From Swiss-Prot:
Belongs to the spermidine/spermine synthase family. This is Polyamine aminopropyltransferase. S-methyl-5'-thioadenosine binds at residue 29. Homodimer. One of its GO terms (biological process) is polyamine biosynthetic process. One of its GO terms (molecular function) is spermidine synthase activity. It catalyses: S-adenosyl 3-(methylsulfanyl)propylamine + putrescine = S-methyl-5'-thioadenosine + spermidine + H(+). Spermidine binds at residue 83. The keyword Cytoplasm applies. InterPro entries: PABS, SAM-dependent_MTases_sf, Spermi_synthase, Spermidine_synt_N, Spermidine_synt_N_sf. NCBIfam families: PRK00536.1. PANTHER family: SPERMIDINE SYNTHASE, SPERMIDINE/SPERMINE SYNTHASE.
Length: 262
């Protein structure tokens, strides 16, 4: 048996699996979890794959990309995703997290897949809301959008940022789908003073890219090394990974030169 990951519309990967462990379907999402000899458990969420053995890569990168460039991290918002491991990493900063996800059926089905599921859900500083309107009106130090946002989503979320707040969003991989990344940078750059693409260095099982955006905060100039050195129980993230995440090959520097704002 095998499952197929669509990297781009023209590129696919196949993974051998041993068994299907779970199949859950809701109105808007489909979650399947498989057992794999080489990769442990693999979750397929709407055709996108998550590897249980490597969940820490994305969660550490995103959490500390934001956390180590901000002096204070009191309020964090996570929207359009299910990644509770991201919240687990963010709790290293003693912050409050608002997590917006309407699909409780799918979220609760990750109970055995996310290693820190119960720890996060039971944390007194974690608030799960079905929609943004259910939350108290406030400004955030850090906002994560775990699906690529359109211009209207960007406009709505940027109004919820503090003046020096950071907005981190998922995008297409700049090497695999540079036109899509270019368009995403245009959307972000039309709103923010800083808009820079990055990827997870040495992560070979992903087709994701990301964008770091802010009105005032810069992901490299404002990086605080003492905060990185103070982190405990991290397996992937360090200062070298942080800086390397923003490195681009020369051809992509040319492609994005009019879209990157730094």
């Amino acid at each position: 048996m095998w499952i197929t990951q669509e990297i781009t519309p023209y590129l696919r990967k196949e993974y051998t699996i041993e068994a299907k462990l779970l199949d859950v379907r809701s109105e808007h999402n489909i979650l399947e979890i498989f057992k794999s000899k080489d990769f442990g458990e693999i979750a397929m969420l709407n055709r996108q794959l998550l590897f249980k053995n490597f969940l820490h890569i994305e969660s550490e990168l995103l959490a500390h990309m934001g956390g180590c460039t901000k002096k204070e991290l009191k309020e964090v918002l996570i929207v359009d995703g299910f990644d509770l491991e991201l919240a687990h990493q963010l709790f290293k900063y003693d912050t409050h997290i608002d997590f917006v996800q309407a699909d409780e059926k799918i979220l609760d089905s990750f109970i055995s897949f996310f290693p820190h599921f119960h720890e996060v859900k039971n944390n007194k500083n974690f608030t799960h809301a079905k929609q943004l309107l259910d939350l108290d009106i406030k400004k955030y130090d850090l906002i994560f959008c775990l699906q690529e946002p359109d211009i209207h989503r960007i406009d709505g979320l940027k109004r919820m940022l503090k003046e020096d707040g950071v907005f981190i969003s998922v995008a297409k991989h700049p090497l695999l789908e540079h036109v899509s990344m270019q368009n995403a940078l245009k959307n972000m750059g039309g709103v923010f003073s800083v808009a820079m693409p990055f990827v997870a260095p040495l992560r070979i099982l992903s087709n994701k890219g990301y964008i770091y955006a802010s009105f005032k905060t810069h992901p490299l100039k404002d990086l605080m090394t003492p905060k990185i050195e103070a982190l405990t129980s991290v397996r992937y993230y360090n200062e070298d990974i942080h800086r390397a995440a923003f490195a681009l090959p020369k051809n992509l520097q040319e492609v994005f030169k009019d879209n990157i704002k730094s």
